[in-house]
């Protein structure tokens, strides 16, 4: 993973300190997720994940390496175009990086998911910073996911995100829901005390 981070940092001319901080946050979040839900890594490993709102795609590279998993990314067209430019730059530098299917159209993503055996869903902030109609369109994808990892702030506009996630728990009847605050990131830059990590894991029957 450190090699991926160093290559990413080289692409953006980031300092070693920034890269180390980024890796530390990623590692702490994965460690906390696995503490909360011991089945989380088993269900993530070697299967496909969807990341909603991956931004520039750095975390997706780490998820892919850490869990040996194939990634599918969903984002706004302008962000997807920018990310594609970055990935091409990484390729020109002959850096080792994972390739992802990228979608900006929900219907196309939905058709792809229907053909996928087992999926996982990840979103750090972006999903609960989306309108309710967007969230609702993803319900069947969430319901069919082995694991769901969402980091969320407390509110988006007038929407109470934590109440939304509690309601999602009631609707995802085949999943176990565990959540915690982000105190494990207390020393990280930009630490947000009021934000939360939510994990949903499909029950084994």
Model-identified regions with their sequence ranges:
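Conserved Class I S-adenosyl-L-methionine-dependent methyltransferase catalytic core
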Residues: 1-41
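A short, conserved alpha-helix within the catalytic core of class I
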Residues: 130-142
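S-adenosyl-L-methionine
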Residues: 85-115
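Conserved beta-strand signature within the Rossmann-like core of class I S-adenosyl-L-methionine
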Residues: 145-157
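Conserved SAM-binding motif I beta-strand of class I
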Residues: 70-76
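Conserved SAM-binding loop of SAM-dependent methyltransferases across substrates and taxa
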Residues: 56-67
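Conserved class I S-adenosyl-L-methionine
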Residues: 44-55
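A short SAM/SAH-binding and catalytic strip from SAM-dependent methyltransferases
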Residues: 120-133
